[in-house]
Amino acid sequence: MSEKKKVLMLHGFVQSDKIFSAKTGGLRKNLKKLGYDLYYPCAPHSIDKKALFQSESEKGRDAAKEFNTSATSDEVYGWFFRNPESFNSFQIDQKVFNYLRNYVLENGPFDGVIGFSQGAGLGGYLVTDFNRILNLTDEQQPALKFFISFSGFKLEDQSYQKEYHRIIQVPSLHVRGELDEVVAESRIMALYESWPDNKRTLLVHPGAHFVPNSKPFVSQVCNWIQGITSKEGQEHNAQPEVDRKQFDKPQLEDDLLDMIDSLGKL
């Protein structure tokens, strides 16, 4: 029996490993058929949801709906916190990198990285030079085969910019929702444009800030992974095509899941 392939799954802000696992059920089931096991680490920073929106201008905002998280669970986490006085100013605590290093050593090595929102932003940064940033050897973690970003963005703080100047070798799929009001299109495209032309693919779905679970969409993602990891794809160093036409209209399954997500019913 061939060894199981593994994917590192990085959840979004105000989520957790369990919440992200529940919200990627369709993707997980289909990737399992392709021989992949998905691993969900949980960010080390606990978040008080009640303290998120305290100012007068923020009152009435719904954390569960805005961050595509659970309305019932108070056990939610984040990978880093922004400076309240400057959106583009933040530092990722070294314990985050230490935690992920140990997680890779204990559960890896991994074939790919998939992230959502803040987790995709962190994942995109890590993938610029995964082993150097996490202090891993090539024996501990061989070269990653792919990276998928759902609503991910380029880290804005100046201290992280030099990493994006590298020629990133990991093939990437960048997914954004046309109705996403949490992460602006310009921020998603900034991460996308950090990759060389022959190492990046853009996929747009008609939904908002969530990971779609419709069968046509999941099939496209799985087909992309199969194409990028196939012997032919690796030899020709080319990105497989994705069919945008399948997503011109919202899928009923996605709409229902999004409504359920807003109710916090995982």
UniProtKB/Swiss-Prot annotation:
InterPro entries: AB_hydrolase_fold (IPR029058), FSH-like_dom (IPR005645), LovG (IPR050593). Keywords: Hydrolase, Serine esterase. One of its GO terms (cellular component) is peroxisome. Signal peptide: none annotated. One of its GO terms (molecular function) is carboxylic ester hydrolase activity. Its EC number is 3.1.-.-. Transmembrane segments: none annotated. It comes from the Eukaryota. Coiled coil: none annotated. PANTHER family: ESTERASE OVCA2 (PTHR48070:SF6). Serine hydrolase of unknown specificity. Belongs to the AB hydrolase 3 family. This is Family of serine hydrolases 3.
